[in-house]
């Protein structure tokens, strides 16, 4: 009998969470602004998700895009958000703190863990893909293990987990059960089975999304409500949603 591989789905709203569970996900990571890599979801979203699904909910605490070295104002916001999320029923908190030199901010990470555990002693703690930009990933793991972080989300310091498979395998071996290694970024039904076999991981993280169109902007392609990238804006008449069919396709591929 094959060992169970846990599948965590990255979600950006309440509907995403419901569709993830419908597709068979074991757990979700709840964010907002997935295009920016995932930011803190609203407390209303956390409450709505917890009212709608029964699988564990890991809540992202990331107040802004653009790095992981935060001001004191950012940090106070993160602490308040995390406490509110735990009180709203979050099963885990996802976060990441780096110093200006790119190393794990040991002091702030330790203090944040203290804040979380004061609110709920057994809250699950996850250090996110900030680890993918540290100068020494194994040194970073040592710090996180020492501080008692439960899990780390990583692409193996590459653009996708598939490209970072060798590093992820080495991280898994180095951790040796002292911290969970959760690979994510670019994993789908077409590559997940081979990726698992190559790395030996026991869990995977993916988004499994499809595009949905909103006709309310009337096809006006001159209007952009956000910023521009290379002179172009993100289309305002479309957004991505978790697709239960795609979620199930990943699960089917895992089981092959």
Question: Can you name each region flagged by the protein language model?
Answer:
Residues 1-10, 50-51, 220-226:
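N-terminal amphipathic alpha-helix/helix-capping segment at the start of soluble metabolic enzymes
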Residues 2-28, 33-40:
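N-terminal pre-domain/capping segments
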Residues 5-11, 28-30, 57-61, 93-95, ...:
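Hydrophobic faces of well-ordered beta-strands that scaffold small-molecule active sites
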Residues 12-23, 66-82, 132-147, 171-173, ...:
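Catalytic cores of alpha/beta
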Residues 15, 34-55, 73-75, 97-120, ...:
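Active-site-adjacent beta->alpha loops and helix N-cap segments on the catalytic face
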Residues 23, 52-56, 87-92, 115-123, ...:
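A structural motif corresponding to the C-terminal end of an alpha-helix
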Residues 47-84, 95:
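Structural motif corresponding to the early beta-alpha repeats
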Residues 175-256:
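C-terminal alpha-helical cap/extension of soluble enzyme domains
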């Amino acid at each position: 009998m094959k060992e169970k591989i846990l599948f965590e789905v990255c979600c950006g709203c309440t509907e995403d969470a419901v569709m993830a569970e419908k597709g068979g996900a074991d757990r979700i990571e709840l964010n907002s602004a997935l295009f920016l890599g995932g930011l803190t979801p609203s407390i209303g979203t956390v409450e709505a998700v917890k009212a709608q699904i029964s699988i564990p909910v890991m809540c992202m605490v990331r107040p802004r895009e653009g790095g992981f070295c935060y001001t004191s104002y950012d940090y106070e916001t993160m602490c308040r958000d995390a406490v509110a999320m735990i009180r709203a029923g979050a099963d885990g908190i996802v976060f990441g703190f780096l110093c200006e030199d790119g190393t794990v901010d040991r002091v702030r990470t330790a203090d944040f863990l203290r804040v979380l555990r004061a609110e709920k002693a057994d809250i699950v703690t996850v250090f996110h893909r900030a680890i993918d930009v540290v100068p020494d990933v194994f040194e970073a793991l040592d710090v996180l293990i020492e501080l008692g972080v439960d899990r780390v989300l990583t692409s193996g310091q590459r653009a996708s987990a598939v490209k970072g498979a060798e590093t992820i395998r080495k991280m898994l071996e180095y951790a040796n059960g002292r911290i969970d290694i959760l690979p994510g970024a670019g994993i789908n039904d077409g590559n997940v089975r081979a990726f698992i076999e190559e790395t030996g991981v026991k869990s995977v993280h993916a988004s499994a999304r499809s595009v949905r169109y909103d006709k309310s902007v009337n096809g006006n392609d001159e209007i952009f409500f956000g910023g521009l990238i290379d002179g172009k804006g993100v289309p305002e008449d479309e957004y991505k949603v978790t697709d239960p069919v795609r979620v199930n396709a990943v699960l089917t591929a895992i089981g092959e």
